[in-house]
Amino acid sequence: MARARGRGRRDLKSEINIVPLLDVLLVLLLIFMATAPIITQSVEVDLPDATESQAVSSNDNPPVIVEVSGIGQYTVVVEKDRLERLPPEQVVAEVSSRFKANPKTVFLIGGAKDVPYDEIIKALNLLHSAGVKSVGLMTQPI
């Protein structure tokens, strides 16, 4: 009888304790949430090297090249003429006048390697607002 009062058999718990598992999962979730914006902001764009490029024929129509040399810095090149450091409005006016003079003019956009790709997109939008429907991208940096 003394045995039953003092030292009874303890029942073992057969449940799984998931609190440590949840702690680890929440810490991992916080780490991923903190690093996800950093990963998406640091994506670098490497321009491909074109192995099969087509040469632009300049028999009758010399190509009009819009060079993006920096943020908001545009240069329009037609044959030997270089119009440097043009504001976006003047680029649109120059491209529009060239396009209206000859709709078959070839337009190319080139950018320096250190220029953010967003500036190339802005140059594409400028040519689109000037009425140009087809634009080529130069694969060799300027």
Swiss-Prot record:
Cellular compartments annotated: Cell inner membrane
Any one biological process term the GO annotation gives: bacteriocin transport
Further comment found in the protein's record: There are about 900 TolR molecules per cell.
Organism per entry: Escherichia coli (strain K12)
Entry's free-text remark on domains: The N-terminal transmembrane domain is involved in interaction with TolA and TolQ, while the central and C-terminal domains are involved in dimerization. The C-terminal domain is also involved in interaction with TolA and in association with the membranes. May undergo large scale structural remodeling, where the N- and C-terminal sequences unfold in order for the protein to both reach and bind the peptidoglycan layer around 90 Angstroms away from the inner membrane.
PANTHER family: EXBD MEMBRANE COMPONENT OF PMF-DRIVEN MACROMOLECULE IMPORT SYSTEM, TOL-PAL SYSTEM PROTEIN TOLR
Function summary: Part of the Tol-Pal system, which plays a role in outer membrane invagination during cell division and is important for maintaining outer membrane integrity. Required, with TolQ, for the proton motive force-dependent activation of TolA and for TolA-Pal interaction. The Tol-Pal system is also required for polar localization of chemoreceptors clusters. The system also appears to be required for the activity of several outer membrane-localized enzymes with cell wall remodeling activity.
Gene Ontology molecular function terms on file: transmembrane transporter activity
Traits of the deletion mutant: Mutants lacking the tol-pal cluster suffer delayed outer membrane invagination and contain large outer membrane blebs at constriction sites and cell poles. Tol-pal mutants fail to complete division and form cell chains, and fail to process denuded peptidoglycans at the septum.
Record's protein name: Tol-Pal system protein TolR
GO CC, alphabetical: cell division site; membrane; plasma membrane
InterPro entries named among the record's database cross-references: ExbD, Tol-Pal_TolR
Cytoplasmic side stretches: 1-17
Membrane topology type: Single-pass membrane protein
NCBIfam families, sorted: PRK11024.1 (NF008248), tolR (TIGR02801)
Alphabetical keyword list: Cell cycle, Cell division, Cell inner membrane, Cell membrane, Membrane, Transmembrane, Transmembrane helix
Oligomeric form and interacting partners: The Tol-Pal system is composed of five core proteins: the inner membrane proteins TolA, TolQ and TolR, the periplasmic protein TolB and the outer membrane protein Pal. They form a network linking the inner and outer membranes and the peptidoglycan layer. TolR forms homodimers. Interacts with the N-terminal domain of TolA and with TolQ.
